[in-house]
Design a protein with these regions (language model features):
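Conserved short histidine dyad/triad with adjacent acidic residue
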Residues: 65-82
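Ligand-binding loop in jelly-roll beta-barrel domains
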Residues: 118-144
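Bacterial N-terminal signal peptides
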Residues: 11-21
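A short, N-terminal "cap"/entry segment at the start of jelly-roll beta-barrel domains
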Residues: 19-64, 149-158
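Short acidic-glycine-tyrosine-enriched beta hairpin
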Residues: 102-117
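Short strand-coil-strand connectors
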Residues: 59, 99-103
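Glycine- and acidic-residue-biased ligand/ion/polar-headgroup-sensing regions
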Residues: 85-96
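Bacterial N-terminal signal peptides that target proteins for export
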Residues: 2-11
């Protein structure tokens, strides 16, 4: 239980630090969002039909909506990736599998996936018919501000 309290403290601290970063974004930088209260954000995630949508962007954080379906990515998954920054994913709609460092866990609406930097991960939609909609919080910028990609294949390759 002591380990879980430490994890909870880490998550709460990370979320509060990200909120603080959002509130200090600079309006003069057009690549950043202004400080904002986003009402009913999970409903906005459900409305998103794009592969990826940059919802809010700050200097060192970003909120991205994702819609994982065979229409947006024929593989019906994010794809194996590793980041130089932390990532927190909230499952909003649909069911999936989260693979973190080779360990698979089934996920459903209301679940959170915490991914520290450097951890190899993938999120897979387990339904060929229903979308898997997620909200992802990055502790860095993952895609350009105000970007929207209808399909995974639309994302510029690095």
């Amino acid at each position: 239980m002591k380990h879980m309290n430490g994890i909870k403290s880490l998550i709460v601290g990370l979320i509060f630090s990200q909120v603080a970063m959002f509130s200090t974004s600079f309006a003069s930088d057009t690549n950043q969002s202004d400080a904002e209260v986003a009402s009913q954000v999970f409903n906005e995630v459900k409305k998103n039909n794009n592969w990826k949508l940059a919802f809010l962007t700050a200097k060192d954080a970003q909120v991205v909506f994702m819609n994982i379906t065979p229409n947006t990515n024929p593989n019906n998954e994010i794809g194996i990736e590793t980041h130089k920054f932390d990532q927190i994913i909230f499952v909003i709609e649909g069911n999936g599998k989260a693979i973190l460092s080779g360990k698979t866990t089934m996920v459903k609406p209301g679940d959170m996936i915490f991914i520290p930097q450097g951890v190899e991960h993938n999120v897979i939609n387990v339904s060929a018919k229903k979308p898997l909609k997620i909200l992802s919080v990055y502790t860095a910028t993952d895609i350009p501000a105000n970007s929207s990609y209808q399909k995974k294949s639309d994302v510029p390759q690095e």
